[in-house]
Regions:
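A short beta-loop-alpha structural element at the N-terminal edge
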Residues: 4-21, 73-74
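Glycine-rich phosphate/pyrophosphate-binding loop shared by adenosine-nucleotide-utilizing enzymes
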Residues: 4-6, 62-68, 122
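Active-site rim helix/loop that mediates acceptor-substrate recognition in acyltransferases
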Residues: 33-56, 61-65, 70
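Conserved acyl-donor/pantetheine-binding loop and adjacent beta-alpha core of acyl/acetyltransferases
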Residues: 73-126, 182-187
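Conserved GNAT acetyl-CoA-binding A-motif
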Residues: 118-122, 147-159
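Conserved acetyl-CoA-binding loop-helix of GNAT-fold acetyltransferases
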Residues: 131-145
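Conserved active-site alpha-helix within GNAT-family acetyltransferase domains
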Residues: 136, 148, 160-178
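Conserved catalytic-core motifs of GNAT/GCN5-like acyltransferases
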Residues: 155-157, 173-190
């Protein structure tokens, strides 16, 4: 998606529903109605949006939303829990077990990834594309900018339910492969992966 008229700008939270439209079909828990499924997926997304200036969206020349990318430095904070405490009140406690399992997993993998990073490294916490090719385009633009700012390496984690093989084809090196036992099924390991890519 090479287009010189595309616009990279700070992420506007009003565009969060576009991200939900993409990933709700992919990330929804098995229990609950459509409102809970959307709530749970929004909680996952918000856990990947950190309090910093490294939150971006890509628009076309007509201001149509195409993609978003979110990054985190060591020491950054995430305020998703405040949102969760307020929004979760409308759902039964047994539903919220799924949300807490997601949160535990996200925190575990974030901490594991941050532990591998130096202070001049940065983590890609999430990128979502609404249009084919827009994901690669927003990554190309943001990584070029991060490199110019002096960030040395980009880290990210993913799991076996995502297209983890994609990263091998786009300049990333696998630095850790493991199994997350709470999500394992009988005769099927739930594998996690941490990747790294040099920015400088």
């Amino acid at each position: 998606m090479k287009n010189n008229n595309l616009i990279l700008k700070p992420f506007d939270f009003q565009n969060l529903p576009f991200l939900l439209d993409v990933v709700v079909p992919l990330w929804s828990p098995s229990l609950g109605d459509e409102f809970f499924k959307r709530f749970n997926v929004e909680y996952i997304i918000r856990n990947n949006i950190w309090e910093n200036d490294f939150r971006f969206e890509l628009l076309d020349e007509n201001q149509k939303f195409l993609a978003a990318a979110f990054f985190a430095r060591k020491g950054d904070e995430c305020n998703a829990q405040n949102w969760f405490l307020n929004e979760s009140k409308r759902f039964p406690l047994d539903f919220l077990v799924a949300s807490k399992m997601s949160k535990t997993f996200l925190d575990f993998m974030d901490e594991k990834t941050f532990a591998l990073m130096n202070d001049d490294d940065i983590k890609l916490s999430l990128f979502i594309s609404k249009e084919r090719g827009a994901g690669c385009e927003i990554l190309e633009r943001t990584l070029k900018m991060l490199s110019a700012q002096g960030w040395k390496n980009l880290f990210l984690w993913t799991d076996c339910e995502c297209n983890w093989q994609w990263y091998f084809k786009h300049g990333f090196t696998l630095v850790c492969e493991d199994v997350y036992k709470p999500f394992c099924r009988e005769n099927e390991d739930y594998k996690t992966y941490i990747f790294k890519r040099k920015l400088m």
